[in-house]
Swiss-Prot record:
One of its GO terms (cellular component) is early endosome. Keywords: Autophagy, Cytoplasm, Endosome, Immunity, Inflammatory response, Innate immunity, Repeat. Both ATG8-interaction motifs (AIM1 and AIM2) are required for the association with ATG8 family proteins. Oligomerizes. Interacts with ATG8 family proteins (via AIM motifs), and ubiquitin (via CUE domain). Found in a complex with TOM1; interacts (via N-terminus) with TOM1 (via GAT domain); the interactions leads to TOM1-recruitment to endosomes and inhibition of TOLLIP binding to PtdIns(3)P. This is Toll-interacting protein. CDD domains: C2_Tollip (cd04016), CUE_TOLIP (cd14363). Residues 35-152 form the C2 domain. Component of the signaling pathway of IL-1 and Toll-like receptors. Inhibits cell activation by microbial products. Connects the ubiquitin pathway to autophagy by functioning as a ubiquitin-ATG8 family adapter and thus mediating autophagic clearance of ubiquitin conjugates. The TOLLIP-dependent selective autophagy pathway plays an important role in clearance of cytotoxic polyQ proteins aggregates. In a complex with TOM1, recruits ubiquitin-conjugated proteins onto early endosomes. Binds to phosphatidylinositol 3-phosphate (PtdIns(3)P). Belongs to the tollip family. PROSITE patterns: C2, CUE. The gene is tollip. It holds the Pfam family CUE.
Length: 276
């Protein structure tokens, strides 16, 4: 109900102010930007809490069908797995036979069973040129502790599976159950801008639910006795002496994938050495 207040200029009637007084209603596009930003923050805070495991990808080498450079070609690889993007160093003057021997450690989100790989030619004075690409399905037997060493066909300007091949060595490590947290639904509330206050939730408007991960503390996991011997520096050095042509990080990755089993690691490294 309106009230009357006396001022120097006379009586003034003051009524109830509407709920949207001095508020700027955002457009649908602005609301979507806010929701996307909140979802991105939740994903960032969540980190690897919702991951199913860790995938190790060793990008060894590639045999390309054509040199697309004017004088030389400097290829590098880009891998997209889930929301993450990884890159190898540039193989300077690698041309049609680039070698990287780069080990990439990826966290695998639940439900993700493949990744996308692209090869680019690094350019100095123009945009990097995409040479080849392929879609790789993560082998099921990786979860059994095996190491997969395969050549995958590349697609490109020459046609599907006609741009050459790339050699990848993959292993998988499962994250202990005590270190994983189930993702919880996150409520994303539509907001409006209120002058002097900022963005505030809109009363009476239902929130949108997003299956993100909320920031939370990691539970203290009880120490578990290791079932296999850890990778010792002596074993690593011995394997490095046996395979001097292989990169040290590649040997370390294979040894870790075999859970410190030196004999099994030697068999896997012998298969890799035969391909080189």
């Amino acid at each position: 109900m309106a009230t009357t207040i006396s001022t120097q200029r006379g009586q003034v009637y003051i009524g109830e102010l509407p709920q949207d007084f001095l508020r700027i209603m955002p457009t649908q596009q602005q609301q979507q930007v806010q929701l996307d930003a909140q979802a991105a923050r939740q994903l960032q805070y969540g980190g690897s809490l919702g991951t199913a495991g860790r995938l190790s990808i060793t990008v060894v080498q590639a045999k390309l069908a054509k040199n697309y450079g004017m004088t030389r070609m400097d290829p590098y690889c880009r891998i997209r797995l889930g929301y993450a993007v990884y890159e190898t160093p540039t193989a300077h003057n690698g041309a049609k036979n680039p070698r990287w021997n780069k080990v990439i450690q990826c966290t695998v989100p639940p439900g993700v069973d493949s990744f996308y790989l692209e090869i680019f030619d690094e350019r100095a004075f123009s945009m990097d040129d995409r040479i080849a690409w392929t879609h790789v399905t993560i082998p099921e037997n990786l979860r059994e502790g095996t190491v997969v060493d395969e050549w995958y066909s590349l697609s490109g300007r020459q046609g599907d599976d006609k741009e050459g091949m790339i050699n990848l060595v993959m292993s998988f490590a499962t994250i202990p159950a005590g270190m994983m947290m189930q993702p919880q639904p996150v409520v994303l509330m539509p907001t409006v801008y209120q002058q002097g206050v900022g963005y505030v939730p809109i009363a009476g408007v239902p929130g949108m639910y997003n299956q993100g991960v909320v920031p939370m503390g990691m539970p203290a996991a009880a120490p578990v006795a290791s079932q296999s011997a850890p990778c010792s520096e002596e074993d690593l050095k011995a394997l490095q002496d046996m395979f001097p042509n292989l990169d040290k990080e590649v040997i370390r990755t294979v040894l870790e994938a075999q859970q410190g089993n030196k004999d099994a690691a030697i068999n896997s490294l012998l298969q890799m050495a035969e391909e080189l």
